[in-house]
Curated annotation (Swiss-Prot):
Composition skew (Low complexity), residue ranges: 21-47
Disulfide cysteine pairs (residue numbers): none
Localization per record: Endosome
Protein name per the record: Vacuolar protein-sorting-associated protein 37 homolog 1
VPS37 C-terminal domain ranges (all copies): 137-217
Region ranges (Disordered): 1-49
Superkingdom as given in the UniProt entry: Eukaryota
Feature: compositional bias, Polar residues: 8-20
Gene (UniProt): VPS37-1
Length: 217
């Protein structure tokens, strides 16, 4: 009998690499390479930075797992994904993402529901601009026109002109009264009283007119 132990060991040694190759990990080997053997990353590669606190939290979940379970996580992508989704940190992030998605959808629904109301408000604003605003603008223009007329009526030049007309009117009345007196149409007492009153009014207006012309008005 020949000793085939050596050949058996050799055959087992040859079969093990084949088994290992059939269970090659889904991740890149560079992810678990030691720092001393790792090569500098190119500019196109992205390195995931994990804080010490996060790493410690993940180790807590891994420390109770068996070697076979850890190997399965490294070789089975689905198992790794399931483990990743079971982490509290990932659950919190997923919950936040789901909540934000729900809130965004709700805001979109609310905006769609308010679309008819927004259109109605736009129509009302357009009506106001074309009707009520036009009426108010017309009234404002009328008030502006009245204001200009009032300012023009009471302007210094207009007042001086009216005062001059009043002076001329009194002067004409005085001359007419003199003619009546000369023609004996009025007695002396009545003439003096009326004529004095007219001339007093005339001179008072004349003084006001002169003062207004020489002032800064």
């Amino acid at each position: 009998m020949f000793n085939f132990w050596g050949s058996k060991d050799q055959q087992q040694g040859q079969s093990r690499p084949q088994e290992a190759s059939s269970q090659s990990p889904w991740y890149s080997p560079s992810l678990v390479s030691s720092p001393s053997s790792s090569r500098p990353q190119s500019s196109g590669q992205i390195s995931a930075q994990v804080s010490p606190g996060e790493a410690a939290g993940i180790i807590v979940f891994l420390k109770d797992k068996s070697v076979d379970e850890l190997r399965k996580l490294l070789s089975d992508k689905d198992a790794y994904q399931q483990f990743l989704l079971s982490l509290d940190q990932v659950k919190v992030q997923n919950n936040i993402k789901d909540e934000l998605r729900r809130e965004t959808l709700q805001l979109a629904r609310d905006n769609l529901e308010k679309e008819p109301q927004i259109m109605e408000l736009r129509n009302q604003c357009r009506i106001i601009r074309t009707t009520e605003l036009a009426t108010a603008q017309e009234k404002l223009n009328e008030l502006e026109r009245q204001k200009e007329e009032i300012l023009k009526f009471y302007s210094p030049g207009s007042l001086l002109h009216k005062l001059q007309e009043a002076m001329n009117q009194v002067d004409e009345e005085s001359e007419a009264l003199q003619e009546k007196f000369l023609e004996k149409e009025i007695d002396t007492a009545a003439f003096v009283q009326k004529y004095k009153k007219l001339r007093t009014t005339y001179h008072r207006r004349a003084l006001i007119h002169l003062a207004a012309k020489t002032s800064n008005i």
